[in-house]
Amino acid sequence: MLARFSVAYERFCRLLLTIFVVNIAMLVHTLLGAVVLGFFPSCAAAQTTFRTWLRAEDRSMRAKEVWGIFHGVWKNELKQANLFGWPLAVCWVVLAIDYYMMNWHARGTFDVAVSGILFVLALVLLAFTMLVWVVRANYDERPLWIVRTTLTMIVARPLCTLLQIGLALLAILAWAQWPGLLMVFGMSLPMFCTAWIVYSFGRIPGMDIHDREQPGIRYAKS
């Protein structure tokens, strides 16, 4: 019993170390890319690193190995991740402006109804934003294929989608209640939880707890 507890505790500590190292790597590489060019490649590198950790047999990667995986992916993703991430950021800006205009300047039932629709769209976009980087880390496919697959997951995997939205709300509450969590683990903690939810409940080939893969699909290298 004590031996099993010791092994479980060691693995848990290694996981926390991995999440912490990824958080530091995200901060450093985001600044390395002058923020505007470094953030989205950091998101892609973080999810690829977590995918590698989840698929590892012993899940005992050292900090140096975690950093090396992250840095290598970040360099390779400098162009593609920005081409993918900035249109997503524009969608958020447009949706936020529309929601603000309709919600705070509503004058009738129609305006209130539209603001409600925009709120639902914001939840869908939130789930999409959290899932799409995991899907993108798992498949070496075209952007449109990644977008279509992510949208299909949102509809076809309602439990996974609801867990993602709940995770986002929980992360915001936790950051507000315990700011130290944000300082130590940053975005890497909810990003890891997103990867784990997809790994456990998403049932996508190549990143499935049951380890199923399908022929004809190009998977990302672990």
Across the structure, where does each feature detected by a protein language model lie?
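Alpha-helical transmembrane segments
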Residues: D111-L126
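Helix-coil boundary and N-terminal low-complexity module in membrane systems
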Residues: M1-D111, A127-M130, V134-S222
